[in-house]
Regions:
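Glycine-rich active-site loop/strand segments that organize a redox cofactor
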Residues: 35-69
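Helix-loop-beta segment of a Rossmann-like dinucleotide-binding subdomain
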Residues: 59-63, 94-120, 184-188, 292-303
Length: 570
């Protein structure tokens, strides 16, 4: 969407992607996109959507930005509909909406169970129009290495590497917008694509860009267990009537419905995840003694499931071998999304002038917990804000990038060329894939659902140990063509830096808020921590500070999904 908005203004765009754009991780977003269109006459409104989002994020999101997103949401859905997205419809021909977690309204527009893919494909068709017109130039299969920042601390372009030829080049720009997604690979196995290392955001953090709320990591309650990676089972399965249960005293126990009678199986993700973790890990009531519970759709007619959830049910059947139309699925929580990201202002610009960010790469719309189906919305809305603001910035800049000497850009290119050469020459005894496996294990065990300070301290010590061992990596592949090992090693270095941001942010936040839960500090502490965590890079590790959250529109209140939202306002 950022590319489209810039090209609409007649400004040329270079679009870089690690993979072919249609293989970006947005294709894995299954369930839908939120917007208070209110076709079902439930009294929904953008303000209700806004209140649900702020309440669901445990009041850590800046409120004016979130309100702007929720007010724009209905128009965004209608825009995507006009672009040709095949949204499901009611028998009357109206857009159909399903219910997602953390709301009592049917607010989520959907295209079966492949909404992200359909949105991405529709947007790419629009990008191709501008490509034909000569306004957009795609660079697919390029890895972002770093921003070009001049002596005045202004972003002037990027340095990137062609992952086929391994050629490193600089690209001048009056404005740069980062839409590089999340960092799930830091945790080893996750629902994220294997490209989601967070390397680009980490590199910018090391260059002086502030990183906000890094500790806020969403663990999705329903993922398909697997030995290689974890695959998402969409919240839409519960939105269409799926029920989570396990056996207790020899009988089915629908524990979410018992614990949270008001919202049942559609409590927000952090709440459901902690409940499943408690049932399996603390109570030992997982299915067959394993860390798994049932997600049951077998009571719903198969023809209904095929229309609304066919894609994801086929995925489960393919990888597990059971037909979820006939037998309950086995699921368990998995790392899914980063609410934290690059710090940006209301214009989507970072603290480095000329450098913008949108989507999961930045932090401002989800607070301490993202509501399901707000992700695709925030990506599109963030792009709609970032694009025009980047154009406005570029047109009003005092000194154009064209007036800068070539030596500035050559120095950055040489810096990253030298770094690549040093990686190729690493001749130690450590395996980068083994280091990554250890990092993922420690992060998954200690920095996800339940966080204990002593374990967080040991995890940070482990990360520093891995950073020392990183210096002794053995580069088995020294080829200069499509060298995936060298690229992975560079990403691993950046993952290690970001892992410290996440871990130390969690260690220092002595409260429980949204996805961040500490048994030692089980209550929310608004007096000390109704604040955004800001991490800034130093050679000795992240330097943390805190920034007040905008709560000017809705006063913070107790978050309790066992009762209706109205009761919490009393």
């Amino acid at each position: 969407m950022t590319t489209i908005k810039i090209a609409e203004a007649g400004v040329p765009v270079k679009l870089f992607s690690l993979v072919p754009v249609k293989r970006s991780h947005s294709v894995c977003a299954q369930g839908g996109i939120n917007g208070a269109v209110n076709t079902k006459g439930e009294g929904d409104s953008p303000w209700e959507h806004f209140d649900d989002t702020i309440y669901g994020g445990d009041f850590l999101a800046n409120q004016r930005q979130v309100l702007g997103m929720c007010e724009a949401a209905p128009a965004i859905i209608h825009l995507m509909d006009r672009m040709g997205v095949m949204f499901n419809r009611t028998p009357e021909g109206l857009l159909d909406f399903r219910r997602f977690g953390g709301t009592k309204h049917h607010r989520t527009a959907f295209a079966g169970a492949s909404t992200g893919q359909q949105l991405l494909y529709a947007l790419d068709e629009q990008v191709r129009r501008y490509e034909v017109a000569g306004l957009v130039e795609k660079y697919e299969g390029w890895d972002f290495l770093g921003a070009v920042i001049d002596d005045e601390q202004i972003c002037r372009g990027i340095v990137a590497q062609d992952l086929r030829s391994m050629e490193i080049m600089h690209f001048r720009a009056d404005a740069v917008v980062m839409c590089t997604g999340g960092n799930g690979l830091i945790f080893g196995k996750s629902t994220n694509s294997m490209i989601n290392t967070g390397s680009a955001g980490s590199e910018l953090y090391q260059q002086g860009v502030k990183y906000a709320n890094g500790e806020m990591i969403q663990v999705h309650p329903t993922a398909i267990p697997g030995d290689d990676k974890l695959r998402l089972m969409s919240e839409s399965a519960r939105g269409e009537g799926g029920r989570i249960w396990t056996y207790k005293d020899g009988k089915p126990w629908y524990f979410l419905e018992e614990m949270y009678p008001e919202y049942g199986n559609l409590v927000p993700r952090d709440v459901a995840t902690r409940a499943i973790h408690k049932v399996c890990v603390e109570m030992g009531l997982g299915v067959d003694g394993q860390n798994q519970v049932y997600l049951d759709l077998s009571h719903i007619p198969a023809n209904v499931l095929n229309v609304k959830l066919g894609n994801i049910l086929d995925i489960y059947e393919k990888f597990v071998g059971d037909d979820p139309r006939k037998v309950p699925m086995r699921i368990f929580p998995a790392v899914h999304y980063s609410m934290g990201g690059l710090w940006v202002d209301i214009d989507q610009m970072t603290n480095i002038p000329g450098l913008f960010a949108a989507g999961e790469a930045e932090y401002q719309y989800h607070g301490a917990n993202r509501l399901g189906a707000n992700s695709l919305l925030s990506c599109i809305y963030g792009g709609m804000v970032a694009g025009p603001n980047a154009v406005r910035y570029a047109k009003n800049i005092k000194k154009s990038v064209d007036s800068l000497p070539e030596s500035l850009f050559e120095s950055y290119t040489k810096k990253y060329q030298d770094d690549f050469e040093s990686i190729l020459k690493m001749e130690g005894d450590e395996n980068p894939y083994q280091l990554h496996r250890e990092l993922g294990q420690w992060m998954n065990d200690n920095v996800t659902v339940v966080r204990v300070n002593e374990r967080l301290k040991k995890t940070d010590e482990k990360i520093q140990e891995l950073q020392e061992r990183f210096k002794r990596i053995h580069m088995a592949d020294t080829s200069r063509w499509e060298n995936q090992m060298a690229q992975f090693t560079r990403h691993l270095r950046n993952m290690l830096h970001m892992a410290r941001v996440i871990t130390l942010g969690a260690l220092n936040r002595n409260e429980s808020r949204g996805a961040h839960y500490k048994p030692e500090f089980p209550e929310r502490d608004d007096e000390n921590f109704l604040k955004t965590t800001i991490a800034e890079f130093t050679p000795d590790g992240p330097k943390l500070s805190y920034e007040d959250v905008d709560v000017s529109l809705i006063k913070p209140r107790l978050r309790n999904y066992a009762v209706s939202k109205e009761e919490t306002k009393e």
